[in-house]
C-alpha cells in the first residue's frame, strides 16, 4: 500500500452527505497522485481552531462548507479575487514554512481561495462547449438568480465574470434581504442598470428573459416555480444551472428542458469547483485557472465517480 504523504479533507457539520471525497480522490487517481488522500471530518464552528491546531505537515489543504467558509477568515490570507471581495473561502491551502497570520504558532500559514464562483463559470462554459454554443460577448444578456442567500452571492459574482451578461434579475421570497448584492453588481458590472431585485411573484416573467438562470434555493423549494413553468405558452430559451444535485434531475430542470431551455445540474458546479480546489491544493495552479487548463481526462473521471 502506498504511504500517504499529502492529506486533504472537507470540513462541515453535518458532512456525511458530502461528495467531495469521491471527487477529489478520483482526481488524484486521474493525475497519478498516488500518495494523496482526501477525507471528510465533522467540524462545527466551535471546533475549527482546535482542528487546525491538531494538523501536522502532511496536511496540504481543506475544503470548507458554510459557516466555516466565513469562520476561516481570521486564520488565513485571501488570495484570489472573490475570496478577497466576498470574504468567503471554500478552500484553504497550507504553507508549513510560515505560521498563521493571527500569530498562533500551532497553525500553519493558510492561503484562502473561493472556487465556488469559478465552478459556476466553468459549468456554463462546459455546457456551451459541448453544445457548440457561442455566448454573447457584448454584455447584452440577462441572467436570473433564484434566491438571495450566500450561494446567490457567488452566483452573482459568476455572472459578473460572464462577458455575455449585462443585467441580473434576482428573484427572492424576501427581496429586502442580502443588502450586499446590489453594491456588488454596481461595483463590477459595467452597465447602466446592472441589477434588479424582485419578489417570487415575478419569477416566470423574469425567467422568460433569461439567457442564463441559476437556482440557488435548496431542496424542493423551487418545485413551485417548476410547476408554473409548465403553464401553456411559457417558453425558455436560456441555460439553467440548478445548484441542487439531489435529486437529479430536479423538477425545475425537467420543466426547463420541456419548455425549450438547456438545464445543467448542480453536480457540474460541484465537479468544477472541486477540480480547481485540487489544482490549488496540489500546487498545479496558484490562482483561478483559465478555461484552457481544464483536464478532460480528469473531468471524465470525476463525472464517472458521481454516477
Stretches found by the model and what they are:
Residues 2-4, 136-139, 161-164, 228-238:
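Short, conserved loop/helix-junction motifs that constitute active-site signature segments
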Residues 12, 108, 114-117, 124-161, ...:
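Glycine-rich adenosine-cofactor-binding loop
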Residues 190-264:
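Rossmann-like adenosine-cofactor binding region
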Residues 164-189:
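NAD(P)-binding Rossmann-fold cofactor-contacting core
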Residues 129-132, 140, 239, 243-307:
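Adenosine-phosphate binding glycine-rich loop
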Residues 2-130, 247, 255:
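Phosphate/diphosphate ligand-binding glycine-rich loop within oxidoreductases
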Residues 161-167, 259-262:
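Conserved S-adenosyl-L-methionine
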Amino acid at each position: 500500500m502506498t504511504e500517504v504523504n499529502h492529506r486533504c479533507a472537507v470540513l462541515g457539520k453535518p458532512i456525511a452527505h458530502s461528495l467531495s471525497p469521491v471527487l477529489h480522490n478520483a482526481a488524484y487517481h486521474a493525475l497519478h497522485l498516488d500518495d494523496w488522500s482526501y477525507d471528510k471530518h465533522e467540524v462545527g464552528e466551535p471546533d475549527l481552531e482546535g482542528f487546525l491546531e491538531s494538523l501536522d505537515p502532511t496536511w496540504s489543504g481543506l475544503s470548507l462548507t458554510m459557516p466555516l467558509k466565513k469562520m476561516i477568515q481570521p486564520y488565513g490570507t485571501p488570495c484570489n479575487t472573490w475570496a478577497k471581495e466576498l470574504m468567503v473561502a471554500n478552500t484553504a491551502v497550507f504553507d508549513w514554512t510560515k505560521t498563521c497570520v493571527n500569530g498562533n504558532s500551532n497553525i500553519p500559514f493558510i492561503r484562502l481561495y473561493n472556487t465556488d464562483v469559478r465552478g459556476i463559470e466553468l459549468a456554463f462554459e462546459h455546457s456551451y462547449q459541448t453544445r457548440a454554443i457561442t455566448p454573447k460577448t457584448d454584455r447584452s444578456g440577462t441572467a436570473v438568480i433564484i434566491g438571495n442567500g450566500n450561494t446567490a452571492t457567488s452566483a452573482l459574482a459568476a455572472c459578473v465574470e460572464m462577458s455575455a451578461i449585462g443585467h441580473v434579475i434576482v428573484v427572492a421570497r424576501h427581496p429586502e434581504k442580502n443588502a450586499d448584492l446590489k453594491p456588488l453588481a454596481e461595483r463590477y458590472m459595467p452597465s447602466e442598470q446592472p441589477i434588479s431585485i424582485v419578489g417570487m411573484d415575478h419569477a416566470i416573467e423574469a425567467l422568460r428573459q433569461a439567457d442564463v438562470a441559476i437556482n440557488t434555493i435548496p431542496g424542493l423549494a423551487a418545485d413551485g416555480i417548476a410547476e408554473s413553468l409548465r403553464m401553456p405558452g411559457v417558453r425558455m430559451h436560456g441555460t439553467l444551472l440548478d445548484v441542487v444535485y439531489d435529486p437529479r434531475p430536479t423538477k425545475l430542470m425537467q420543466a426547463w428542458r420541456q419548455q425549450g431551455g438547456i438545464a445543467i445540474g448542480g453536480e457540474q458546479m460541484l465537479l468544477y469547483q472541486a477540480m480547481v480546489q485540487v489544482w490549488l491544493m496540489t500546487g498545479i495552479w496558484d490562482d483561478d485557472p483559465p478555461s484552457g487548463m481544464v483536464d478532460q481526462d480528469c473531468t471524465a473521471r470525476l463525472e464517472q465517480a458521481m454516477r
